[in-house]
């Protein structure tokens, strides 16, 4: 992504703005709380990955704190999803996502310990974390779409565009961090025919325009 270093800071600012947009809508649409929690879960997992890739290259304490904040925020969102009595998703669907998140947290903990103990990452463990993170977030996205369809709640199109843009940008940040700081970037980015970062940037711009319309 040839201009990623120029885009990353504006994208981060946009993520914060879009998150506030979604949270504001949450207060107005009580039936949308379950979706908002799933949204928060996806965002914070990507932010934790983004911070971890940077931490793996520097062992910087501030970056480690960002990882912890991301994981804790995702954990809070997951607890809300698990504790919800909305009935939007089945217990089995929620438990599947929760188990996947438990595996993700375990791998994140192991990877952090490797960096702290040895001063550099274990590439095999990093690849496992990347694969688990991608699988987990794919599942979360599938469940989010299913929850939208089955909840019977009318969602605001602008909020949905904002959420989609925020998740996409958080994913882009994590992918770019993987490319910049580790040799497992291809594992995280997936197959060669996956949408490129440049294409994702165009998709983000389109979603952002829809959110602002």
Which residues does each predicted region cover?
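Bacterial N-terminal signal peptides that target proteins for export
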Residues: 2-12
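Bacterial N-terminal signal peptides
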Residues: 13-21
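Sec/Tat signal peptide C-region and signal peptidase I cleavage site
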Residues: 23-27
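Short, charged/polar, low-complexity loop and linker segments
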Residues: 28-29, 50-54, 145-149
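N-terminal extracytoplasmic segments of bacterial inner-membrane proteins
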Residues: 33-62, 69-72, 104-109, 154-185
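Charge-dense, low-complexity intrinsically disordered segments
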Residues: 35, 61, 91, 123, ...
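Heptad-repeat alpha-helical coiled-coil/4-helix-bundle sensor or tether segments in soluble regions
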Residues: 65-128, 132-135, 139-142, 198-213
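Extended amphipathic alpha-helical interaction segments
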Residues: 118-213
